[in-house]
Curated annotation (Swiss-Prot):
Protein's gene: Spdya
Major site of localization recorded for this protein: nucleus
Native organism: Rattus norvegicus (Rat)
Name of the featured protein: Speedy protein A
Similarity field: Belongs to the Speedy/Ringo family.
Keywords tagged on the record: Cell cycle, Developmental protein, DNA damage, Nucleus, Phosphoprotein
Notes on the domains: The C-terminus is required for CDK2-activation, but not CDK2-binding.
Length: 312
């Protein structure tokens, strides 16, 4: 976070030079028409002096981010459940980079300690961010089973109370500007959570009124639903396991599992339509190429080495 943005309301480069009344008293009096400007100048001078004597204040509250706070936030994404949750949100409709940045800002505004950087607080803050920013209400309900487990239907009223408590703790300042989000992301731009770009066709206030297609929430036991906008089989999104918790072999195993699922799915399609055999070969090759790119990405990216070091 840049600390050179402490700007007072009056631009510091503006200087007003006004002659004092004592200098004017020794001057030869002009016609009476100058008396009113003299009074006006005196009033303006006192107004400017009173304004300049006010203590300089920043234009708005600023966040001072400590290294250990950002490190604790990033460690949340070492959680297997949160990683699976992000993989499930393959279209980045619930947890794109801006919503995740808002989640971090809520942690800061709530003055969470390191011990309060927990899974449940992450989901509560993310739910609040969705409530504030997203027009589509149904998508955020997917958070319930991930945060609360199989008994989420009994527990979600208490979850909403915790959301309200967080809202109160941040003094009801739930709006986060785009600029603030981008400055948070600029601290460690190479981290994989800041690569979660939402597609344009999932932006804006576009509702889906066909309730028979998908029943939400689906929970951790379900696979990501096919997206009619991103393609029949959905959009492949980099899970981006952090280097601190997972090696390249982990993502190879994961992509291998997805590849097998794709193979089985396409094999069933071929049974119904043998003419798709050539298409399957091309899709499988494309998927293998993507898998290799993901492996290379994990090997090359050491995104959070700076945060892993102890402060000097």
């Amino acid at each position: 976070m840049r600390h050179n943005q402490m700007c007072c309301e009056t631009p510091p480069t503006v200087t007003v030079h006004v002659k004092s009344g004592s200098n004017r008293s020794h001057q030869t009096r002009k016609p009476v028409s100058l008396k009113r400007p003299i009074l006006k100048d005196s009033w303006q001078a006192s107004e400017k002096n009173a304004h300049n004597n006010k203590p300089k204040r920043p234009r708005g509250p600023c966040l001072i981010i400590q290294r250990q706070e950002m490190t604790a936030f990033f460690k949340l994404f070492d959680d297997d459940l949160i990683q699976d949750f992000l993989w499930m949100d393959c279209c980045c409709k619930i947890a794109d980079k801006y919503l995740l940045a808002m989640t971090f800002v809520y942690f800061k505004r709530a003055k969470f300690t390191i011990s309060e950087h927990t899974r449940i607080n992450f989901f509560i803050a993310l739910y609040l961010a969705n409530t504030v920013e997203e027009d589509e209400e149904e998508a955020k309900y997917e958070i319930f089973p991930w945060a609360l487990g199989k008994n989420w239907r009994k527990l979600f009223p208490n979850f909403l109370k915790l959301r309200d408590q967080l809202w109160d703790r941040i003094d009801y300042r739930a709006i986060v500007s785009r600029r603030c989000c981008e400055e948070v992301m600029a601290i460690a731009p190479s981290h994989y959570i800041w690569q979660r770009e939402r597609s344009v066709h999932h932006s804006g206030a576009a509702r889906n009124y066909n309730r028979d297609e998908v029943h939400l929430p689906r929970g951790p036991s379900a696979t990501p639903v096919d997206c009619s906008l991103c393609g029949k089989k959905g959009r492949y999104v980099r899970l981006g396991l952090s280097s601190s918790s997972s090696s390249s072999s982990d993502i190879v195993e994961l992509t291998g599992k997805r590849s097998q699922e794709l193979h089985n799915s396409l094999s069933m399609d071929m049974i119904g339509d043998p003419s798709q055999a050539n298409t399957y070969s091309q899709v499988a090759n494309d998927h293998q190429s993507k898998k290799e790119n993901e492996t290379n990405f994990v090997k090359k990216t050491k995104s959070m080495g700076w945060f892993a070091e102890s402060e000097e």
